[in-house]
Structures are given as structure tokens and as C-alpha cells.
A protein has these predicted regions:
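Active-site-proximal, substrate-binding regions of enzyme catalytic domains
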Residues: 2-107, 114-160
Length: 160
């Protein structure tokens, strides 16, 4: 076990939480990071939890972790005029996550929405948010814009 280890705080969107749980690494992530979410993510998780498939099962498990206070739910208070617009590729949940990052000065947003990535990066750069952490649901590789990982890459698989 690590001693004197301070967890890094991150904000995660709905699909990344579901992907991490479906991949079996959400609880490990919670051991390493303090995960916060805006209230809209809880609403989206409840919607997904209604499905009788792997995503629904994962959403129900994430909701249980929220009830156990292993994931913090935060109210988003400050929304600037620019951020209040929901872009075509960025949904309300992702925009709320970006707003929470800005409001609480949390430097890392965890998402797996590759379609929204260009707009998320643009918005984060406009608002001087330096880090977006992208979880690739198709593999265990992860890509970060402006962020060094806390662990070293595997010797035969350098980070891109």
C-alpha cells in the first residue's frame, strides 16, 4: 500500500464511469482518485440503469457506489454564458462535467466520448483547463491531452 499518498481529484462523465465498471477497473480507479460528478450524471446513470444489459448492470453498480459515498456528487453553480450552450458534439452531461472542473478547479475530466473530444479540448483550452483524460472503451490504453500519467508505460508499449 502507498503511504502518504494524496489522491488526485477528477471529474468523470456518465459513459466513462460505465465503461470503467464494465471493464472491471472502476473500484481500482476509486482507490487511486477522488471521483466527483455533477448531479446530471446521476440522472443519466438512473436512465441507463433501466436497461437489462451490461451497461444497465454497470450503471446500477455505479449508483450503489454513489450511495456508499465512494463517488462525490457536486452541485454545479457557476455556468458562464459560453458554457451554458450545449454544443452539437458535447451533451449536457459533458458540459456540466466541464463546468464542475472549472468551478472546483479540478484539472482532470475523465471521458470516453471520442466524438466529443475535439470540442471538449477546444472548450477546455478556452477556459484554461489543461487536462482531459480519455478512457478508450475498446482497449485498456488511455490517452491524455496535457497530462502525464501517474504510472509508467509498459516497456514494450510506450505511450503515444
Amino acid at each position: 500500500l502507498l503511504t502518504n499518498y494524496s489522491k488526485t481529484e477528477v471529474v468523470a462523465d456518465t459513459s466513462s464511469l460505465i465503461s470503467l465498471q464494465t471493464g472491471g477497473v472502476l473500484e481500482l480507479s476509486l482507490d487511486l482518485f477522488d471521483v466527483s460528478i455533477p448531479e446530471i450524471v446521476v440522472t443519466e446513470l438512473k436512465d441507463v440503469a433501466g436497461y437489462d444489459d451490461a451497461h444497465g448492470k454497470s450503471a446500477r453498480y455505479v449508483l450503489r457506489l454513489i450511495k456508499e459515498d465512494k463517488i462525490s456528487v457536486r452541485e454545479v453553480i457557476s455556468i458562464s454564458e459560453t458554457e451554458s450552450r450545449v454544443e452539437s458534439r458535447v451533451d449536457a452531461g459533458e458540459m456540466s462535467c466541464l463546468n464542475l472542473c472549472r468551478q472546483e478547479q479540478i484539472p482532470i475530466l475523465v471521458t470516453d466520448d471520442w466524438r466529443a473530444l475535439p470540442k471538449l479540448i477546444e472548450i477546455s483550452l478556452i477556459h484554461k483547463r489543461r487536462s482531459l483524460c480519455i478512457c478508450d472503451p475498446r482497449s485498456t490504453e488511455q490517452t491524455c491531452a496535457g497530462l502525464r500519467w501517474h504510472s509508467q508505460p509498459e516497456p514494450d508499449r510506450p505511450y503515444r
